[in-house]
Amino acid sequence: MTYQQAGRVAVIKRIAGWLVFIPALLSTLISIINFVYLYSQKGTGVNAVMLDFIHVMTDMARFNTPFLNIFWYNSPVPNLEQGLSAGNIMFFIIYMLIFVGLSLQASGARMSRQVRHIREGIEDQMILERAKGNEGHSREQLEEKIVLPHHTIFLQFFTLYILPSVIGVLGYFVIKLLGIMIQG
């Protein structure tokens, strides 16, 4: 892949990363809000006040964001009692798409940095080639020699493999803690 092609691929990867990340993040957040809203039961004392606050905030967010109705009505709500149900699997897939989008964006940003560095290197080399006179290489000859490797998102280890696991474990403990607080 030439460095001009790499520049275009880098822009496409960055745009695709944001186009995957933003809807996946919105859907996941709305799924979690709906989960807390649906599985919070009426309680007494301080818990009742907290649950009423959660219900009011959820209703207010839903009312004030009609442009997100596609997410409010279609985002899968996880159910801890059902195990591998369709809703839980869809929630997990959408959750993982957050990190796929981040990895795409990071891969595109890395390619963009490399292309910028190569472009600056070619400009520097052209100054030296002009100093050589007729013996120097042309810009086209220098560009033909440059071949960039393909960048895959699967090499983004932290973003794609570690971060989802850490956030998932923390989320599991928070949900369990909320479940304990709600029950008593």
UniProtKB/Swiss-Prot annotation:
Transmembrane segments: 15-35, 84-104, 162-182
Membrane topology summary: Multi-pass membrane protein
Compartments where located: Cell membrane
Keyword set, alphabetical order: Cell membrane, Membrane, Transmembrane, Transmembrane helix
Stored Pfam families: YniB (PF14002)
InterPro entries named among the record's database cross-references: YniB-like
Main location: membrane
GO cellular component, one term: plasma membrane
Family affiliation: To E.coli YniB.
Function: Putative regulator of YfeABCD, an ABC transporter locus involved in inorganic iron transport.
Entry protein name: Putative YfeABCD regulator YfeE
